[in-house]
Amino acid sequence: MSARVCKTHRVYVGRDVRNFMDIPDLIEIQLRSYDTFLHGARNTPSGADTLISGTREELGLEDVFKTTFPIESSTGDMTLEYQSYSLDEKNIKFSEAECKQKGLTYAIPLKALVDLRFNNTGEIRRKDIYMGDIPKMTERGTFIINGAERVVVSQIHRSPGVVFSHEKDKEGREVFSSRIIPYRGSWLEFEIDQKKDLIYAKLDKKRRILGTVFLRALHYETREQIIEAFYAIEKTPVCQDRAEYELLTGKILARSVTVENEQGETRVLYKAGEKIHPHVIDDLLQNGICEVYIINLEAEGSLRSAVVINCLEREEMKFSKSGAQDELSREEALCIVYSALRPSDPMTMDAAEKDLQTMFFSPRRYDLGRVGRYKLNKKFRSDSPTTECTLTLDDIVNTMKFLIRMYSGDAQEDDIDHLGNRRIRSVGELMTNTLKTAFLRMERIAKERMSSKETETIKPQDLISIKPIMAAIKEFFGASQLSQFMDQVNPLAELTHKRRLNALGPGGLSRERAGFEVRDVHYTHYGRMCPIETPEGPNIGLIVSMANYARVNGYGFLEVPYVRVRDGVVTKEIEYLDAMDEDRYYIGQDSTAVGPDGVIRVDHVSCRHRGDYSTRSPKDIQYMDVSPKQIISVSASLIPFLEHDDANRALMGSNMQRQGVPLIFPEPPRVGTGMEEKCAYDSGVLVKAKQDGTVAYVSSEKIVVCSAAASGEEQEVVYPLLKYQRTNQDTCYHQRPIVHVGDRVQVGDALADGPATYRGELALGRNILVGFVPWNGYNYEDAILISHRVVKEDMFTSVHIKEFSTEVRETKLGSERMTNDIPNKSEKNLDNLDAEGIIRIGSKVRAGDVLIGKITPKSESETTPEFRLLNSIFGEKAKEVRDSSLRVPHGVEGTVIDVQRLRRSEGDDLNPGVSEVVKVLIATKRKLREGDKMAGRHGNKGIVARILPEEDMPYLDDGTPLDVCLNPLGVPSRMNIGQILESELGLAGLRLDEWYESPVFQSPSNEQIGEKLMQAGFPTNSKVMLRDGRTGDYFQNPVFVGVIYFMKLAHLVDDKMHARSTGPYSLVTQQPLGGKAQFGGQRLGEMEVWALEAYGAANTLQELLTIKSDDMHGRSKIYEAIVKGEASSPTGIPESFNVLVQELRGLALDFTIYDAKGKQIPLTERDEEMTNKIGSKF
């Protein structure tokens, strides 16, 4: 028997649409990116321990080493050369489980083989150097940093390359500009001044320079060279023929016309770039010139605008010496460029040359990156090698040409929100950038050490400091905006977090600066980014999710698969296209009728081309979508009937599924979409078989599978199961076996369920019987009325695990001790503690109970002879100690399920001054109760308002009571009709005992749902007569009844409810603190004061503003009065008033208060002293 038998059998209901491809691995973006970072593009078999430099493509770590090395000393006598690196898989110190328990980082040692070469003698000293620990990614695509699971979110940012834009400035003038954006280095911008018809260059956002002046600084030294770079040139005869004469008039000379005088000297008659007028032709003929070279503005490849010629004229007017015929020299052009870059610095020719050279043409200062080069090649259809990562003169000329073409209407501007201009930086690339910066610091230190160490004794390991590397890694994983605490509420939350794309973070956008356009849905998002799943707050549109089939290519651009169509026939070829390639094709919809032979059976196909939607003949389309669900993300594709929901509610539905708490008894949805299995499988919470075999042993703690080894003998593979583990969000991570002894399993089969999964499918909630009927106002405004049966049968009961820890420290007065002998505590309070003062596993605890008894030495006052006598008699006990026990905080109760101890004496790495850390895990069983938030998959959320006895709930004619009553007014205005269709199909499934698969955009029609309802014996509109549970009478009208999949969300009332009688006060204002975390009070704000004033409740108001808040004197007096049973004394002055007085005194305003009798009221101790002094004088 195969383990596959355990799976829920689903009946497909919906339109017959062909899916050409299965969904790829959903966390591939994380795994592949980090694997490339660690190993490069591997050419050797996986698992090879060391790879010799040269067998890896220069990506990731290899790129980091190659960029930094060789490191040469300042004198040039020694060089550090890198040979290869290795990852020491065998020496990983701790396993994933140990790292989580001990609060460590799961990492792998990195070693580099480095040569120290002495250039004078040729001697080489080689050493394999430890370069620090690199965090290792788990199989689930996460990192364990300081014991907590973290995810590095991929960043979407503006791609390096060239961008052409056309916008209006503040004065309303049109500005045509282009920017060459490198991966690292200075920006180069060009803009056209429409008023003057000139092109300017801007280097690093400094003062603008005339375009031709910049070109002259880049070795385009003559007018002829500049003109040839931009225009087509042709030779033309000069003659007196009238027709030829007129044709030549108005043309522009491409080359200067020179003549020789009688002495044999050559002089320029007309410069290149000058316009030919009739008198010029006469002059040429008189000087015996028969042919000239002119610019052909209409020729192919030539610019049609004379912008460059205008620049040459402007340059001559502005810079040529009076009366001189000479052109601007390169040296003069360099001076102009340098003065624009560094206006205050003294100018030297060498400095100007070097500055410009390093700015754009030095690999150390300027890097286009592989992506930038790829983008430039694609834009200008050039074939520069991808290794050419600096700018070339051709790049600069091509940029200027394209900008001028755009200005003259021959080229289109770029759309900066197009996904061809935005790319993904995944974890591998982010780590590469972090390490490059760290290695630069290491290089500086190595150079300093080279000049200070003795040559005879120096070794490679003496020169390399790994501190900057370790610090950078720690800072990146611990503090970077993109390294996030993993959202671990349920498997879907984990999966979605790993597929998230973030436009924020270093080098990205900021919430404040991001406008509407960058947040909006763009046509290139189709199949790449989900148009639905995004947060609702200020991050809307900036944090998005990858679509189901999308992948990131080698350049970081999102690609989407399409099936190839040739002559109206759909082939089996799958091709991935990025956004730039896709713009060239017509792409048909997947809903098109296609025969088994691949022939498209309709005359007109709905298709897309760029942002336009139209219908075309099947022969006109080149590609077709591979699946209807390729445009949305994982969360959205779990919502059945998604196409019937309003976009806002679909967004809420997909976001709220991630908040569903794993239940003790989960159930997969009766109406699913077929994505449940894939989602659970790729999330990493299931235990999967690593090889074929037979299940030999099953228990709650492990599964043993016997499989045939290569030698022919049977070998046992043990799969341990995780039990009651705490997640990042305090939910319970628990695995249960789903196979039985004797089952045959294949590689990849699910052996055990994880949290929120059932039989290998995602199960975030429960299917419950719902009626859309008002009930005494208890389901007003989205409130939910629920049956006690749901609570009684633990349908929505979940387990939550909290961790509390304490440290045993060495103090200056002696060490802290754990003990069950705590001063001033009765034996009854300490019953559950063992001999060492630690709570016993299995104990039930409530708020205030001691978990770990601990005492701390107090500072000893001057010891009297009596105290010394007592100390000598009773020893330690008489010493003054303070109770510093770990107690259960307010609002927490549960059962102690585990106690973990980390001791320095046993080799655990603890903080300085800490000898032991003890962690206590408390599990709480949370039943559904009033105030808990619940939601369906269609954005239909609400709060449980009342739990009604089962017998009072409305019931069907056969006696079945409803589980939930929802308000019917919650549907029309929200326009989430998907919940209505889901409940109809779910009701039929309940009666027929069927589980349905209805994929997104392939949903069944009303007729198909009606057929199922008829089979089940229900009316086709799903409306039935309900009886009132209290009276047994029918309701006046038929009620819509169905089965909806509901989830309990992580917003539980137990975590939010809070009350305070006594508690801490603020040190300055003496008012109670705020918030549950600080055990604060309720704030009486302005509006609450107004309300009490309106009712004239003067005494209540005075009490709330004084003794119940910050009247310190009044507080103690009222306590005394209550204890003694006396009448309450009058209130004093609130402390916040004293604070105000002190602030006014700080402004040098003398402020004194007097009572009704004219006597001064002291506000501070100093005031009191002054008053007493004055009183004593009189």
From Swiss-Prot:
GO terms for cellular component: DNA-directed RNA polymerase complex. It is an enzyme of class 2 (transferase). GO terms for molecular function: DNA binding; DNA-directed RNA polymerase activity; ribonucleoside binding. This is DNA-directed RNA polymerase subunit beta. DNA-dependent RNA polymerase catalyzes the transcription of DNA into RNA using the four ribonucleoside triphosphates as substrates. Transmembrane segments: none annotated. Coiled coil: none annotated. The gene is rpoB. NCBIfam families: PRK00405.1, rpoB. The keyword Transferase applies. It catalyses: RNA(n) + a ribonucleoside 5'-triphosphate = RNA(n+1) + diphosphate. The RNAP catalytic core consists of 2 alpha, 1 beta, 1 beta' and 1 omega subunit. When a sigma factor is associated with the core the holoenzyme is formed, which can initiate transcription. It holds the Pfam family RNA_pol_Rpb2_3. Keywords: DNA-directed RNA polymerase, Nucleotidyltransferase, Transcription, Transferase. One of its GO terms (biological process) is DNA-templated transcription. Its EC number is 2.7.7.6. Belongs to the RNA polymerase beta chain family.
